[in-house]
Structures are given as C-alpha cells and as structure tokens.
Amino acid sequence: MQYTFAGKGDYETYHPTRTFFGYRFLSITATDEVRIKSVKSIPVTSITKEMETGKITTGNDLINKLISNTRWGMYSNYLSLPTDCPQRDERLGWTADTQVFTETGTFFANTDRFMHKWMQDMRDSQSELGGFPGVAPFAQYGNEMMRLGWADAGVIVP
C-alpha cells in the first residue's frame, strides 16, 4: 500500500477504510525529512473482550509467546467468518483450516454464536447430495464438495 501525504499543516493522519491487513512489520519510507509522532495498529476482529474465556500462563517465556501468537492468530482470522490467513487477498472461510483450529478457538473465547453463523453458511453452501464445500460461504474457488479434510468441518465444528 502506498499513501502520499499532502504536506499541508503540522499534522496529518491516514486511516484506511474498507480493508484490513495482516502483517508483522511496517516500513515507512519518506523522501523528505519528516517527524513521525506515532504509528498505531488497530486490531480488527469479531472476538470481543466479553467473549474471551480461557487463559493460560506458564513459567516458560517461549511457551507463553506461542500461546499469545495462537490467540492473536484467532483474533486475526475470526472476522465475520473464520479465515485461513489475514495477510493475503484470498481471506476465505476454508473449512479444513477452521475444523483444525475450532477446538483451540473455543478454549480462548466463547465462539458459539460466531461458529453458529458460519455453520449456517456451511449448510447454505451444501450440495444437493448434502456434501459440504471446501469454502463457506460459497466462493469463486474451493467449491469441491465432500473433499476429505475440508468437508469434515461440517461434522467436526458443530
């Protein structure tokens, strides 16, 4: 993403709308001398603080970091529907990814309503024979029905 500031006034801000990005690092390049007062990352997720349930802390900093990364993975991927990754344009509700992470997600947060809505997407996307898709809601690809691993989500997630 590239944004050019107008250069008017002492302070300018930029806040993208109708999009989100998954990232670990941010790079800012300026052609002129600038003073950056602050850069703020705003998490966007369907998991609210009120939904959070489980918490675990160990005496090992590496394990605690793994737990934190897992929690942030949930925050990053649970946005209206469970996605497989927030950093690509794809951002689809891949069913295999969801069924693998669902149990962990339910430890960290009360995801009942969130998953109930997504399971309705699964039912709406079922084939006439009852097969579940690879992606829910139905999308431009990932629509092969009854694929082992992906279709299993229709039984494992609920």
List each language-model region with its residue ranges:
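Extracellular/oxidizing-compartment recognition motifs
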Residues: 1-87, 113-118, 128-129, 133-142
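Alpha-helical support elements that line or immediately flank enzyme active sites
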Residues: 15-18, 26-29, 95-125, 155-158
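Solvent-exposed, acidic/flexible segments
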Residues: 56, 60-63, 94, 108, ...
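Aromatic-lined, polymer-binding surfaces characteristic
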Residues: 85, 91-98, 124-158
